[in-house]
Amino acid sequence: MWVPGFGSARLPQRRRSGLESSSVRPLWLLLLFLLAAVRPVRAWESGDLELFDLVEEVQLNFYEFLGVQQDASSADIRKAYRKLSLTLHPDKNKDENAETQFRQLVAIYEVLKDDERRQRYDDVLINGLPDWRQPVFYYRRVRKMSNAELALLLFIILTVGHYAVVWSIYLEKQLDELLGRKKRERKKKTGSKSVDAAKLGASEKNERLLIKPQWHDLLPCKLGIWFCLTLKALPHLIQDAGQFYAKYKETKLKEKEDALARIEIETLQKQKKVKVKKPKPEFPVYMPLENTYIQSYDHGTSIEEIEEQMDDWLENRKRTQKRQAPEWTEEDLSQLTRSMVKFPGGTPGRWDKIAHELGRSVTDVTTKAKELKDSVTSSPGMTRLSELKSNGQNSRPIKIATALPDDIITQREDSAGAMEDEEHEAAEGEQESATTEARPRRRKSARAAEAVTRVEPEEKLRGKRQKDFDISEQNDSSDEEKQRKERTRAAEEAWTQSQQKLLELALQQYPKGASDRWDKIAKCVPSKSKEDCIARYKLLVELVQKKKQAKS
């Protein structure tokens, strides 16, 4: 049963499939025709090239050369070859060309006896040799050329190619300029104002620079010019090469010298003896107590007893140092005096420099300088205040000895030297003035000092006797003693070992003569004022002076 709507809908699909099949069929037919038209391709072989060369050499028909017909059998060709070989053999033929004729006969026979090569020869007879339109023609010519001929041919080809490339570059630039000129003309006609004058000037310069290739642009001329310029520049090139080689040698020598110097420095550093550090004196370890306000010694003891204990400890320490220090010779003493003149009072680090020159410790040098000063300033008839003090102390009853705490004073070589610097700077000025003054002046000063030392104990004895009878004077003196003791006690209790060390370091850092010295020292010691530092310093100086007076 036919439905009207569906039949009309299917009909166009059938038509499309028929059209598609009709368009594909001609393509298949065209491909088959092309495949059938293609002939088998055969390349030229070495046998073909030898055959072509033989044909050109003989310049005769091979069949005519043997005396046979073209359709002759191989047996007939063999018989003809034997007959001709007997006549053309060099042993029987005395002709000059006998060898070449016999060689050609053998080559012709080799071609005709083989059916395949004979068939190729027949094709040559029909079609002839390859002409100039075939590549094998040129190949056969090139095969016969020598090396020189090949080089010449290659050079000619390169020359022609180079000249053609030069012309192509020139024409290309000319074409670009022509197109650019036309574009500019169009822009001018349209009235566009975007044309830049600089671009126009550059294009005109390029047009002027364009030059047609000349005969000297040929490759042989270029090579000749390059060769001449190379010969001219050859001396300069040789000179530059020599300079470069000399610089290279210098750099190599410098590198070797640097390497040797480094090795020597390393060996010297290895050979250097390790400096033995001097053993630092062992100080008693300070252990802070939980109760910092606990008294470390009996405040009822006098300052003289504390000084005696301090002197005993310092004497024991000095004895050990004296054992280690070498003895002083006359040369050492003269060197000491010269160094003291060289480094006068007020010089920063004076005693360190003097000790460095003498090769001794600072304490050893300062003690010896003090001894020299005492020996110069004192006379045999003088009585020292320290001797009177010691006599007075011996007459007093002995009290309980108390140990001096470590936080009062810290003895070190550097710190002792620094404080002794402060003491001896004034003394050195006296020593230098005493050495420069005349002898009568010394006698006067010695007598005056003697008188002072004699008057002082008398005044003290008188004062003591008056105080025994005068109650007000006794009270005043007791008040003064109490105040002095309270000050010393406050100074002793308030100063810790770390603060004492900081004070000693600050005294070394800011020597005598520095501006705002005590302000800077007070800044270095925490929680201490300028007055505290000065009072502490005075106390330490008094202790050291008393110790030295007792020793002397």
Curated annotation (Swiss-Prot):
Tissue: Widely expressed.
Record localization: Endoplasmic reticulum membrane; Nucleus membrane; Microsome membrane
GO BP terms, alphabetized: protein folding; regulation of protein secretion; regulation of translation
Positions of the SANT domain: 323-377, 490-545
One Gene Ontology molecular-function label: ribosome binding
Compositionally skewed regions (Basic and acidic residues) per UniProt: 453-470, 480-492
Sequence ranges on the Cytoplasmic membrane side: 171-552
Region (Disordered): 370-495
Modified residues (Phosphoserine): 379, 477-478
TM regions (residue ranges): 150-170
Any one of the GO CC terms: nuclear membrane
Protein's UniProt name: DnaJ homolog subfamily C member 1
Native source species: Mus musculus
